[in-house]
A protein has these predicted regions:
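Membrane-proximal extracellular/periplasmic loop immediately following the first transmembrane helix
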Residues: 2-54
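Small-residue transmembrane helix packing/gating motifs
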Residues: 5-9, 121-208, 212
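Ordered hydrophobic segments in well-structured contexts
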Residues: 10-14, 43-50, 65-70, 98, ...
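Hydrophobic, Leu/Ile/Phe/Ala-enriched alpha-helical segments that form helix-helix packing faces
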Residues: 26-37, 103, 107, 169, ...
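Short acidic-hydrophobic surface loop/beta-edge motif
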Residues: 51-58, 116-120
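Hydrophobic secondary-structure segments that place a key small or acidic residue at a functional site
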Residues: 62-72, 83-143
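Cytochrome P450 core scaffold surrounding the K-helix E-X-X-R motif
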Residues: 76-81
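Juxtamembrane interface at the cytosolic side of transmembrane helices
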Residues: 213-217
């Protein structure tokens, strides 16, 4: 999971239900920017949360319900509880998932579940890791048509990498503007709620609440 030490290079956006952005639009935007030769492209992780989806342990025949977080990008960016077993998997992994300790206990009776399979959204997924969360949650790779309501842009810190087209580094001070401009260029409406990590990291009290807010709204 991400830490507050890294908050300064992140920009968080929340999209209302009617303004959520399909995963395929995000991938198309990144491809388009790369084709145009733009420097300092952001690393984007986006996700949405659906409550009480059916999940099943196909081996034991146990079933239950869990909140499903569909993720485009890095699982660790969309998960605030720490990892207690296994790994987060790779960005390109479309067959792996992450589950909470509470769900592991409910369906498998233990936490040593990395490598086992769980069924959700009409597909079996191989469990890559387990998070320290007593509630029932599963994180899966997003599908093309999944509407993302939360988006995190990660830019290089100030002084790292090349400078952008305007001659400034996309670091803490320019993260918000860079994210908004990225969406504007690709005809994607900006999120209703916008939090610039440069300011969040300076306010520890607010910063601690951010991971809870972005995964529970």
């Amino acid at each position: 999971a991400w830490t507050m030490r890294d908050a300064g290079c992140h920009v968080f956006m929340y999209f209302g239900e009617g303004d959520a952005v399909e995963k395929q639009l995000i991938t198309h935007a990144l491809d388009s920017e790369q084709e145009q030769g733009r420097n300092m492209l952001p690393e984007i992780t986006a996700w949405s949360r659906a409550k009480r989806l059916k999940v099943m342990n196909p081996g034991l025949g146990r079933s239950g319900e869990a909140d499903c977080i569909a993720v485009y990008g890095l699982m660790e960016m969309a998960s605030y509880p720490r990892l207690i077993g296994g790994t987060y998997g790779y960005r390109s992994d479309q067959d792996g998932c992450l589950i909470s300790s509470g769900l592991a206990m409910e369906l498998f009776g233990g936490l040593d579940v990395a490598g086992k399979y769980i069924w959700c959204r009409q597909k079996p997924y191989k469990i890559r890791g387990v998070t320290d969360d007593s509630s029932h949650v599963i994180l899966l790779p997003a599908k093309d048509k999944d509407a993302m309501r939360y988006m995190m842009f990660t830019y290089a810190r100030s002084g790292e990498g090349r400078t952008g087209e305007e001659g400034t580094s996309h670091g803490m001070e320019t993260g918000k503007a860079a994210a908004v401009n990225f969406l504007y260029r690709n005809e994607i409406k900006s999120g209703k709620v916008l939090v610039d990590g440069a300011y969040v990291s300076a306010a520890a009290g607010l910063g601690v609440c951010i991971p809870l807010w972005i995964t529970s709204v």
